[in-house]
Amino acid sequence: MSGIPNLKDLVFRDTPFANLMNKRIYNVLLIATKYDSFMLEDDGRVDEQIFNEYTSLSLRYPPRFTQVTTEEEALNELKNRNFELIICMPNMDNRDIFAAASEIKVHYPNIPIVVLTPFSKEVSKRIANEDLSAIDYVFSWLGNSELLLAIIKLIEDKMNAPDDTASVGVQIILLVEDSIRFYSSALPHLYKFVLEQSQMFAKEALNDHQRTLRMRGRPKIKLARNYEEAVRIFDQYRDNMLGIISDMSFMHNGVKDPYAGYKFGQYVRKTGLIIPFVLESSEASNHVYAKELNASFIDKNSKSYPQDLKKKIMQRFGFGDFVILNPHTKEEIMRIKDLKDLQKKVFQIPDDSLVYHLSRNHFSRFFYSRAMFPPAEVLKHVDVSDYKDMDEARKLIFDLIVQYRRMKNTGVVAVYQKDRFDEYSNFARIGDGSLGGKGRGLAFIGAMVKRYPKLESDNFAVNIPKTVVICTDIFDEFMETNELYPVALGDADDETILRYFLRASLPSRLIEDLMAFFDVVKSPIAVRSSSLLEDSHYQPFAGIYSTYMVPKIEEKYDMLRTVSDAIKAVYASVFYKDSKAYMTATSNLIDQEKMAIVLQEVVGSRYNDHFYPTMSGVARSLNFYPIGNEKAEDGIANIALGLGKYIVDGGQTLRFSPRHPHSILQMSTMDFALRETQTRFYALDLKNMAEAFSVDDAFNLVKLGLKDADAEGSLKYIVSTYDPYDQIIRDGYYPGGRKILSFVNILQHDVFPLADTLDQILRIGQQEMGRPVEIEFAVNMDPSDHTRATFYLLQIRPIVDNKEIMDEDLSLVKNEETILSSTSVLGHGIVGDVQDIIYVKTGAFNSSNNQLIAYEIEKMNRSFTNQEKGYVLVGPGRWGSSDSWLGIPVKWPHISNARVIVECGLENYRVDPSQGTHFFQNLTSFGVGYFTVNPFKGDGWFDEAFLNAQPAVEETEYLRHVRFDAPITIKMDGKKSLGVVLKP
């Protein structure tokens, strides 16, 4: 069984269709008398005929024709412009066309030259006696513009075949024919058929752009006019040969050989390659040679020759329907129309039929003809004798299709087609407008995941949730049809606006599309805003509009009503009071805002009447609060059990650096773990069927405790257990004892590589966006196997908060300009609204008074809370230490209004800095800066003398409070851990 492919080791990469057909004919030089060119154009322009021909076949880039009448004019044009093809017509008045072609070839050896001539016996004799060494091809003009297209495509195929076959495995159809008149007739038929088939197969592509690109992967046609040329082309492209069409009689060793086609067929068959062969002949008796070669036969004299050729190619080369035959009777068993049809029917194919078609490479040819190269390459090398059980072969074909479809669907914004959207579809759009900010972000994520398949591991898939975006043009239609702008832009309250929107009707064409989406998505659906401004690189609009979650309802019309109401409620949120106020504050106009809607499966699992994921998270590629061995560029992540609303609302999350997942401050001591870890979480209430929508988009979410999660069985693999008897925290889940959300199996024991995946995604995201990024994600563990999980990327956005933009080099700021400066700073940004500094007087400092100092600070902080003002707090030792000999033992509520906290060492009071660890969660949640200063050893600067010279607002035995007339400026560079407090 060693020959059976292992799909786990196989990574399908998307075919780079954009890199195919790179060499094209854009300009054609036509050398002909005015009369000949008139005959060629048939009283119309060649450009127009070619354009019409291209358009009818969905081809792009039709070439432009430039007509000249003499060799001199031709050379002049060639000198001044680039041409990719020269077409000559005989009967030039002043010089023989063949001599002229030879002269042109001397100067321009790389430009193909084609002679196009009306045919007669006289012309045939003349050509037979001419030196054709300068001519690439001679064609017989029969008055059809399809020949011009065939000539252009033949030359383009010749130019591109070496690169395109080598890079992705584009297939070759070889036509062997020496009759000028015959191949001038056959090639247009052949090209038209191949192009029409490719156009039809391209409909399986997901959008117009993909369809156009996929046409580039069509089989190329090569023309051989003698035996030696046929063998050379075959040998060059034998591994990419889709099929061969050969005449029986043509030149061999310089003479006409009536059996040359048969001999060439024998040459092909001796290679052992299974290649369809069609033998053509004007003598019907030659069909016996075709039978000997196991080839099809076509009578060239048949009046139905074009139809016969089309039929044979359809049957033998993999075009058209895949007809599954009974190998014994050759009766049709079933017909397979496309990829999805094959996926559905592959397990219905009888064993003997499967062996018959696999052994003859019919399956690989089915894929090759449709430019589906990755699965074709695998199936081409399958040896059916390796399979003792044909169900394994069926499963291989099925799994190949699934893997291929998933690969094709990832990273592509498909046009939503209700009959094609299924469980393997990933991202589609309804409408022609914008996707909005979230929609664009999701599309970008999908493309990024596709470009980096190594993000995934065997037990940890990386994906985006199944998504459909309702574009902004649907919003426009909804607003205008229902005449909602007057109430939306007026002064109505939020509840009134929502009521009007819920009464309105969505465009009727959405109904069937939504119904089809419900059939595919088996989980609850998130209805998310995706406005034009949201998640913009320069517009921090995240979280301004509503997101509703809708439980899965089995009755489809109830589901339709609920999702429709959610869509309308999201539309209404554009015009709520807070949205309008935010628009004004950010200098945006409300009537310029447009809303797309993201419909997305909610990540998670069902636990009784609740639905939530194993974890939700937010991660940033920059960490402005690095501690220990962490660096700013290592990034930071916050994760929590349940829905992401808990994180957005500022809940207690587990915070770690993806590059240091074993060093988690919250788990560093038992006291921290018990006090600073998550105890509540959000879940979707599946019993709340949203009978009446509320302005509050969280109306059907419930906040639960860890005991609820424990009862529902969702904690087993993500917690540690506190043993109160032994006073220890044990890794893992044990009966009894308090459960602590440590995610220890994932972060410390690497059950699946969350930290490494986050690190890679943040690095790649920053690289792709060209700036630091923030991502939202969710992880859901496989309920049947806790070692497997799926990581879902929900959003990516650049970090654009203005306070986090720091271009100044703070190391250049002189000490005399500052009250404080530090080279050990946590936090980032510029604070410009603080006028007050509270500092512990160092002159008579004694650590035995630290408890009294804490009381005084609490009292002062209370007055700042009442005034809703902030201040800078400076003092010696570790702030928040439970040991009052090491620092002032304040709790967070005692200093909650401090905007910057400073640990200042003294010559006679040297304590290792705490880096704010005692209330680290509060520092990071509220963006508070933390400075460490040790002036006595040249580490930082504190100008206490300057503060002592300022009048005090309040002064106690231990503290002094100074207020400046104007705000002081505080600057923190979290990337370099530098910070200054400037003098006013």
How should each PLM-predicted stretch be described?
Residues 1-66, 130-137, 141-220, 227-228, ...:
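Non-catalytic signal-transmission and effector/linker regions of two-component phosphorelay proteins
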Residues 10, 39-42, 46, 51, ...:
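Conserved phosphotransfer microenvironments
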Residues 34-39, 71-73, 85-96, 120-122, ...:
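Short acidic, S/G/P-rich loop/turn micro-motifs used as interaction or catalytic elements
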Residues 97, 127-138, 289-298:
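As written
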Residues 116-118, 280, 300:
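Hydrophobic/aromatic residues positioned on beta-strands within the core alpha/beta folds
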Residues 285-412:
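Terminal, compositionally biased segments used for targeting/anchoring and flexible tails
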Residues 417-456, 505-905, 922-925, 949-983:
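Conserved mixed alpha/beta core segments that line enzyme active sites in large multi-domain catalysts
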Residues 466-514, 582, 820, 824-830:
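A structural-propensity feature for long, helix-poor, extended segments
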